[in-house]
Structures are given as C-alpha cells and as structure tokens.
Swiss-Prot record:
GO CC terms, sorted: chloroplast; chloroplast envelope; chloroplast stroma; cytoplasm; nucleus; plastid; thylakoid
Molecular function (Gene Ontology), one example: nucleoside diphosphate kinase activity
Active site: 197
Species: Arabidopsis thaliana
Gene: NDPK2
Main location: plastid
Cofactors (names): Mg(2+)
Name used for this protein in its record: Nucleoside diphosphate kinase II, chloroplastic
HAMAP family in UniProt: NDP_kinase
Length: 231
C-alpha cells in the first residue's frame, strides 16, 4: 500500500486489541500479531531474471553500451565522398519547348555545380560518335536525325554522386514509365522526345564531357554553398 496516511490507517487495523477486549471483537481480516514488512519483502524473490549476474549476454550488453554507438558502412561512405562529373544535354525538343531553365533549376536545387554550358547546332559526326553504342539499333538513323534537327544545350555538372543522382532526376528512358517528379515523368510523353540526356556512369561522364567540350571551356570555381551541402 502506498500513501501519505497509509501507516496511520494500517496500524489500528493490524495491532492486537487491548486486553479488555476479547478475541471476538478483533478485525476478522488481520492477525493480532504485528506485521514485519521487512521480513515479508525479503522473503519475496523474482521468479526469473533477464540476465544472470555474470552471464555472457550481460557482459555483451555492458560492452555494447559502453562503446560508441554508430554504424560504419565503408562502401556507402566512399560513394558519398566521391566528387564526380556528368554530361547533361537538353535535346532539341527541350529547347523548342522552352524547358532549359526548368532543367537547369532542378540540378541547381539538388545542389550540383554547373561547370560547363553552351548551346550549338550538333553536327552529324559528333552525334554519331556520342551514340556509337547504339549504332546497331534500328532506330539509330532516326535518333541522329532527331539530335541534329535543332540546337542542343550542353552542360557539365559536378557534385558528390552526381552521375547516379542525375539519372534519378531525369527518370527512365520511356517517359510513360518515369516516376512523377522526374524531368521525363513530369515533362515528356514519348521515348523519341524525352527532352534530356544524362551520362550513365562516371567513366562515360568524363568521356562525354571531353567529347562535347573543348579544352578551356570548363570553368572550375568554388561554390559559396559548398559548406551547406557537405560536412
């Protein structure tokens, strides 16, 4: 029992009656003898313990609690620290539809740094070299005709994990399968007019930047926001 007045209320119930009163007048719920609470509590023992005093589980728990908490995943840490470059190209349909600013804005909001930008009419030879891995495909001639049908905007972007992140921002090749929120998912409806190109690997990022930009056309600069994007 717990309470400020529990002792005063308990005592008259459980003490022996005065000598002049007979046993019939005793409270039927109490014994005439005084109750020794310390003895009663000492007699109580828990039926089980989660860990014995020196069990292996207890020692492991103590060791883990004293160690610094944290998870170290070196492969994730390494990927998070790699500053990469990727090539992004707004295709002729993206320019005709006035989407250049929208596309640049999405990459800037993500925190990537623009280090190269130019607009020009793509010659056929350059388009064929860029898409040479697709030269055996039946749609290759139409692809080259499409890319050379109007000016393109060439961009080089820099950032931590920029290649994979840019691919996610762009969305799947088929706009109808691209997730809402991606460039293609929001702004395109057909594979043949999917607005933008992005490098599919860090190696291709370097190759494509070297293909579309001449020496001296890239601008290396320090962003004032860098400390707010990375620790």
């Amino acid at each position: 029992m717990v309470g400020a007045t529990v002792v005063s209320k308990w005592t008259p119930l459980c003490v022996a009656s005065p000598p002049e009163r007979n046993s019939a007048s005793l409270n039927p719920h109490c014994s005439p003898a005084r109750v020794n609470f310390r003895t009663a509590l000492a007699a109580f023992r828990p039926q089980f313990r989660l860990f014995s005093r020196n069990s292996a589980s207890r020692r492991r728990l103590r060791a883990s609690s004293s160690a610094e908490s944290g998870i170290f995943l070196p492969h994730l840490v390494a990927s998070m620290e790699d500053v990469e470059e990727t090539y992004i190209m707004v295709k002729p349909d993206g320019i005709q539809r006035g989407l250049v600013g929208e596309i640049i804005s999405r990459f800037e909001k993500k925190g990537f740094k623009l280090i190269g930008l130019k607009m020009f009419q793509c010659p056929k030879e350059l388009a064929e070299e860029h898409y040479k891995d697709l030269s055996a495909k039946s749609f290759f001639p139409n692809l080259i005709e499409y890319i050379t049908s109007g000016p393109v905007v060439c961009m080089a972007w820099e950032g931590v994990g920029v290649v994979a992140s840019a691919r996610k921002l762009i969305g799947k090749t088929d706009p109808l399968q691209a997730e809402p929120g991606t460039i293609r998912g929001d702004l395109a409806v057909q594979t043949g007019r999917n607005i933008v190109h992005g490098s599919d690997s860090p190696e291709n990022g370097k190759r494509e930047i070297g293909l579309w930009f001449k020496e001296g056309e890239l601008c290396k600069w320090d962003s004032a926001l860098a400390t707010w994007l990375r620790e």
